[in-house]
UniProtKB/Swiss-Prot annotation:
Keywords: Repeat
Inactivation phenotype: Knockdown in the nervous system results in reduced lifespan, mobility deficit and shortened synaptic branches of motor neurons.
Sel1-like repeat start and end residues: 32-64, 66-104, 212-247
Name of the protein in its database record: Cytochrome c oxidase assembly factor 7 homolog
Annotated source species: Drosophila melanogaster
SMART domains: SEL1 (SM00671)
Low complexity: bias regions: 166-179
Any one GO cellular component localisation term in the record: mitochondrial intermembrane space
Function summary: Required for locomotion. Probably involved in the regulation of formation/maintenance of motor neurons at presynaptic terminals at the neuromuscular junction.
Family membership: Belongs to the hcp beta-lactamase family.
Amino acid sequence: MAYDLKKESDVKEYVEKLGVEYRFGCYSEKKPEACHLLGDYLEGIKKDFEKASKVYKSTCDDYGYAKSCYKYGNYSFLGKGKSGSKGNPQVAYEYYEKGCNLNDSDACLHSGLLLVSKSMPREIDWNVPKGLEFLTKSCDLNNATACFYLSGMHISGVQKKADQSAVTASSGSGTSSPPAGQPPLKDSDYIVLKDMKKAFQFAHKACELRNMYACANLSQMYARGDGIEKNEKEAEKYKKLALEMQDEVKKQHDTLGFQQGVGMPN
């Protein structure tokens, strides 16, 4: 049957049919992709977050479907789908880690961020080396945001002191200095050393993966000669690219976060 998606009645019928197809694919044919799409349907179309949460959880637990593990991690962190819940960061981390082990780049990104950022909940222990592993894996899986965060970490370094912020996803390149009156920091004071060459490499990859902030950083690195030989032509090239991306973002409209199980962005 052909649908005229300009007609409200046809749209409603089409959407209802989608739900039937996803339920059949999930519960009768036992297809994990269909189960995940059912979760997206319940979330995006029906706005039934409680049922969506249950579907994502079971699809992760029963089938090891990576994107569902990531989605349930998000639900757990936010307390979404559970009335009155404030969220459970520890459960969220468990599902992010499971999703990362199943090679979902977003799950690796969130696993890493929970471990390296001091702004995260107390339930999660600060563990920069392990967090760095997760972020590196995410970047290796071509997650632009992870590559950008890794670049920021190497721009400023990560100090051992517990009261220092771990992740510095800088909007501009450069290095930080100790407060006036304090002795300069030594290499032994850092968990992750400042390394502008590595910062450049991660920024370059993030920019190639269309992270506009990384492209802006790359422009500044070329302009200053940070981590790479100074090159005004390249600096202008990446500045122009970052501005083009900024314009693209402004033109984008909110879209339904649907079919995330088959590679759609969140």
